[in-house]
Amino acid sequence: MNNKHPKNKAKSTTTPKTIALNKRARHEYHLIERHEAGLELQGWEVKAIRAGRANLGDGYAYVRDGEIFLIGAQITPLIQASTHVVANDRRTRKLLLHRRQIDTLIGRVQREGFTLVPTAMYWSKNRVKMEIALAKGKQAHDKRHAEKEREWQRDKQRIMRAHNRNA
């Protein structure tokens, strides 16, 4: 007998895995190294994230007292949010990392002049995780060079498609 629906089939999640992306980070920074970090969130923030109300556009991470905090990332509260909780959409949130990871990141930021930039927020086993990247700021000429490279890749693909259609 052919059973098409096994009992031990993994449940499909209804929420998409990626919550928010920081597309501007790739444009404005050279991303050197990426790390996964947890986020210390309040209940209303998790509900708002489930509703897709997170924005990483202006966010960055900084070091204070041997800990790493996220500032500038916006999580807009839901309209139905509780009245007894004051919801600050741009509050400072603590990033949860292992001590060894924190120490290496702090060292690279302080000694080598890197910046910590959030690049993505996503779900991992019903927990909100954030991908942060060690980054160096791009100069204006670097941005222009990257744009020219993207245009060339696009033109090259267009030429190859036209050539393959005619062949």
UniProtKB/Swiss-Prot annotation:
CDD domains: SmpB
Bias kind Basic and acidic residues: ranges: 144-158
GO biological process: trans-translation
Pfam families, sorted: SmpB
Stretches for region Disordered: 139-167
Coiled-coil stretches noted in the UniProt entry, renumbered to this chain: none
Principal location: cytoplasm
GO MF annotation, one: RNA binding
PROSITE patterns, A to Z: SSRP
Keyword field: Cytoplasm, RNA-binding
Compartment list: Cytoplasm
InterPro entries found in the cross-reference section: SmpB (IPR023620), SsrA-bd_prot (IPR000037), SsrA-bd_prot_CS (IPR020081)
GO cellular component term, pick one: cytosol
Keyword presence, Phosphoprotein: no
Family under the similarity heading: Belongs to the SmpB family.
Physiological role: Required for rescue of stalled ribosomes mediated by trans-translation. Binds to transfer-messenger RNA (tmRNA), required for stable association of tmRNA with ribosomes. tmRNA and SmpB together mimic tRNA shape, replacing the anticodon stem-loop with SmpB. tmRNA is encoded by the ssrA gene; the 2 termini fold to resemble tRNA(Ala) and it encodes a 'tag peptide', a short internal open reading frame. During trans-translation Ala-aminoacylated tmRNA acts like a tRNA, entering the A-site of stalled ribosomes, displacing the stalled mRNA.
Protein name (record): SsrA-binding protein
